[in-house]
Amino acid sequence: MSDQIYFFDTTLRDGEQCPGASMNLREKLEVARQMERLGMDVIEAGFPCISDGDFEAVHTIAREIKKCRIAGLARCVKADIEAAAKALEPAGERARIHIFLATSKLHMQFKLKKAESEILRMAAEGVSYAKQFVQDVEFPRRTLPAQTWTS
């Protein structure tokens, strides 16, 4: 395991969820440029499938920012992964698809109505599919029991 620490910023996506915190494309690009100047390792630029505006923001930031990895968020759904891959094309080797899937017991039981084994299968398939487009795929373990992910 590496001792290297990487900084991953979600301001352009997660930060926009705060009331009154939305940014237009120019503002997002300005923030991304400042993050680049500060030496941020990874910038999560948006959720490309959610709107044309988010797609364009991710695509523009992927094209303009040269020193950081650029991430696009996607659910474990082929259409989301494809939208993220398309938006991230200008980033080339710096592209990262950040996949998520509801994994808490409550979400699995009541929202997705799926067993843990099915969630694990969906996660593995989503990561494998994303790897067809980019080399860097992130899938955070969120509230699944630790024993599920041990080898």
What kind of feature is each model-predicted range?
Residues 34-37, 60, 129:
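Alpha-helical scaffold elements within enzyme catalytic domains, especially in hydrolases
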Residues 79-151:
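Hydrophobic, small-residue-rich alpha-helical packing segments that form membrane-like cores
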Residues 16-26, 45-49:
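A short N-terminal beta->alpha junction/helix N-cap motif
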Residues 40-75, 102-112, 140-147:
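Glycine-rich, proline-tolerant flexible connector loops at the mouths of alpha/beta enzymes
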Residues 2-5, 39-41, 66-70, 92-95, ...:
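Short, well-ordered coil/turn segments that N-cap beta-strands
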Residues 28-46, 88:
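Catalytic domains of carbohydrate-active enzymes, especially glycoside hydrolases
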Residues 1-22:
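N-terminal amphipathic alpha-helix/helix-capping segment at the start of soluble metabolic enzymes
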